[in-house]
Amino acid sequence: MRYPAKQTTQWLKLVLGSLILFFIAALMLFNPASLITSQQAKNDALIAESMAYHIGVSAYLYGYPLIDMTSQMHNETHLVEDNQDVYAPVNKLYRFNHLITPQTAGNLRAPNSDTLYFQGWYDITQQPLIIHTPDTEGRYFTIAITNLYAEVVHIGRRTTGTEERLFALVTPNWAGTLPDNITPIVTETPKGWLLGRLLVTGSEDFVQANQLVEQIWLQPLGEFNGQPSNKKTEKINAQKYDFKGSLGFFAELNRTLKTLPLRPGEAALLAQFDEIGVGPNVTFNADLLTPPQRKGLEHAIKDAEDIIQASTQRTITSTNGWMISKDIGVYGYRYIHRAAVVKGGYGNLPEESLYPAAVFDENGDLLSGSDRFRIHFNPKQLPPVDGFWSLSAYKLEDAQFEPNSIGRYSIGNLTKGITYNEEGGLTLDLQHEIPAGASNNWLPIPKGHFMLVMRLYEPQQKVLDNQWIPPSIERL
């Protein structure tokens, strides 16, 4: 049926009018303003979560050594648990008056049994700290002064000699004066860690070595009178700090950054930290985080921990079966590398000591006490050191010594009775049971899987330049 043109026009107007009314009603029903607001809220949440995540990863990697150090400082200067292994108030020393054995290792990982340890946590926020060292008459000792950024300076035989000395630990901006007989040692952060080692040459030397360690003491400058203080300090009980893996990490980082001077070249980075409430110019409060911010930071913690764990393998190079880490003690802007090193512990500068380690033999198989091994040094391959060297074996699962029948936990150039061949070479026997022949050169090893750690104190330049490496580990 055909309609006249006039009727067709009226019909189209009616249909179009109805459609317009329908769309107006639909728009009123769906409220475009609410659609825009909803999308904006999603965008804001995405931005907040992404910023918290990306900046949070950077902040976690940057702050890892700071929080590791401040947590340990709190836990070892307060009584935080029953039968605590290490405790000494701030600016006091804790002395291990014994060589490390399986029974006395405490919380030390892969400890040495060649030196007496002593340690303390310093706080020079208000005034310098005096460090007294006695005349060791050439005996090896070292004190590693580690700041909150895990960077190290040394007092000891290599750097300051072995005569009786007085030092003052000061911050870079300290403007006071010291007596002429006190040498300033600058450390970048007002808080940090002192870890000392003093050589013991044998059981008959133990008493004298302990006496020397007792003559190493600390005293705030304002109390200094040339003599160690007998002042008693009150023991303080406290809850244990453990911030890693939680939002408490960022709260502690925020508190710590507020106490530290701005480092050159880091202003922009710390300004970013401010954006998520972690930097030094704001105050972090986990209770005020929005759900997207919380989600982003929690994700950042997990991924940053994974990055650090993966990066621990990049800090070590393997040569001839031995893994040697030389790039420690000074880090600059290499925050991931710094965190990876701290994950495994704190070390001396390479010039002070190096620690080649091995978990595989010359064929790439895991070392196990069910087999026997041999390491042979020809005369020109003996470790080139100005201090001393030694070799120790540890259980692989926990980096601790395993008891053995002769109580020997290291062997090296200072071991009494060690035997060289006619040409001046040296062969070390590594096995769980006592060798059939002479045992002078025997290092007992754990029954199961184990790792070897060689210690090179005051390594010569050829070691630092990779011109010397330990010989391979031969499975017999």
Question: Which residues make up each language-model segment?
Answer:
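Hydrophobic core
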Residues: 23-28
